[in-house]
Amino acid sequence: LHSIYKPKTSKRKIASLKAFFHYCEFYEFIEKNPFDKIQIRFREPIILPKTIPLQTLELFLSTIYTQRQLATTPYQQKNALRDAAVIELLFATGIRISELCSLKPCDVNLNDNFVLIYGKGSKERKLQIGNANVLKTLNEYKNTFSTEIESCDHFFANQTGKPLSDQSVRRMIQKYAALAGIEQHMTP
């Protein structure tokens, strides 16, 4: 198996066989499970997360701020500000999109420059925001979107006053990556 398939595939096939023989033993189709005494360990290669090159990130952020400057209507200006705040916080802290979308106003402390994140497994972590530009953008966003933030009780809201969804943020990232001419798949 190991020479034909990748370690994850081999593990999956063996797990399926183990489950099948356990089922057969449970319903007494067989007396003894042949996998009871077999212990197989596979070494899986450690895959490091992909990073976004600094030049690409700078191009991406400059595109967002260019779009913000090009915004003419109040609606476009408001959206551009929100988009800049979302992207800046994502890249400054490295939080997951789902964590960003679930942020409550009380989780974002811009006076002490930190964000409280409730991650997977209800783990709480406090992330410091050290970049002055990010803090400035977040403060501007908070002041501009104060009504929407209060109405939906989430820090990031859309124009209708509802919490920003994961999918909206992913579309936002794709939109600005396309505008910047970045072909690399962007995930914060």
Residue ranges and their predicted role:
Residues L1-P188:
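Conserved catalytic core of the tyrosine transesterase superfamily
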